[in-house]
Amino acid sequence: MSKCPRCFTALNPNQYLWTLPEQSGGTRYRDEVATAYSGAPADCGPLYTWSRSPGYNGPPPPTSEATRALQAPAVEICPVCHFTLPEGWREGHAICIALAGARATGKSLYIAVLVKQLELLCERFGVSMQPVTRGTAQAYATNYETPLYVQRGLIPPTPTVRTQTSDHREPLMFSLGIWHGVRRFLVLRDVAGEDMESGDLHAPPFRFFAHADAVFFMFDPLRVKTIRDQLHDLLPAQVVSGGDPRTVLTNVLTAVSPGQPKLAVILSKFDVLRALRDVEGSEWGLIMSNGGAAYLRDTSDGQQYDETDGQLLHEEVRSLLLRLHGGSILAAVENPATGVRLQSRNFVVSALGHPPSGNRLHARGIAPFRCVDPIRWVTSGFGVL
């Protein structure tokens, strides 16, 4: 059973809904459902619905039946949020990931680099990773690829749900090819740090958290003053902003409830911590010079996700978080106030490999580190990647 790429709700095989796209012309109606879930005014054409009758075990009607009823080429939409479903979406399997973190944790940079790394990984497996829609291709190119890979600069912060343009509202949908006889899709949804810090996460635009297969919570080590102080002379000047990651994590866990997705706790911008190797006489310098540590090795491009390495890394990152005064984050994950502990794992990633200089990339370019680890932890459970 696949999921809607916007609300992440499992698509009910007993309920189908079609409408006419805007380009078909004809009367348009304000769509209160789509407006609520997108956070922006939306309209739709006339609707055609089908619900399975008691005792009927046959297939649902084809789209051609809706086309005849609506007298124009119909498109299928999600019965819950009215998002237009790509052709063949129900027949595939969508793995849905939500990304969360305070402002300036590097979520957008991570997405930009992650897609490139996944393309290379899929190529190694002999499958092609492609955008599912032109909307995804355009959104990725405009919001992620061009600022980072073409302009060689950093990516602007993700707009809030109330200020987003249409290409920011578009979930990023990618086809991962055929695995075990089923077409697999990967859906990525990024949420503005400002929304995570102070938004109403019970509102319809954020209900996808409860239905996600996994939530990636990203934590920036530069939020720790003792780390910033030790790196003062080693790194270019950094703009430190964003809310308290503990508050954001609490909000994330509230938004997730009552769902039970996997939770990846990701120490982002790990290149910052690796720079501590050059701090002479520092405890952190010794920690970051441990050549046997899993957090200094990148095994993420192996033939399959290395569960043993993943568990070792999990424990090492747990220790790092304690040293980073992140005990409250670990407590929220391991003993949450909701009373429901999610399956979780700790990771380190570096999207760039080297700290940027202001708003420009480091002269050495982009050197990603362990970026696909969290994704492979999730997809390997489905026999993918």
UniProtKB/Swiss-Prot annotation:
Keyword Cytoplasm carried by entry? yes
Q: Which domain of life is it from?
A: Bacteria
* UniProt keyword ATP-binding present: no
**Major site of localization recorded for this protein:** cytoplasm
Q: Where in the cell is it found?
A: Cytoplasm
Consequence of gene disruption: Secretes greatly reduced amounts of EsxB, protein is synthesized intracellularly. In single deletion mutant EccCb1 only rarely localizes near the cell pole, while disruption of the probable saeA-saeB-saeC operon completely blocks polar localization of EccCb1. Loss of DNA conjugation when disrupted in recipient strain (MKD8).
Role, per record: May be involved in assembly of the ESX-1 / type VII specialized secretion system (T7SS), which exports several proteins including EsxA and EsxB. Involved in DNA conjugation in recipient (MKD8) strain.
Q: What else is known?
A: DNA conjugation in M.smegmatis is unidirectional with distinct donor and recipient strains; mc(2)155 is a donor strain while MKD8 is a recipient strain. Mutations in a donor strain that alter DNA transfer do not always alter DNA transfer in a recipient strain.
**By what name is this protein known?**
Putative ESX-1 scaffolding and assembly protein SaeC
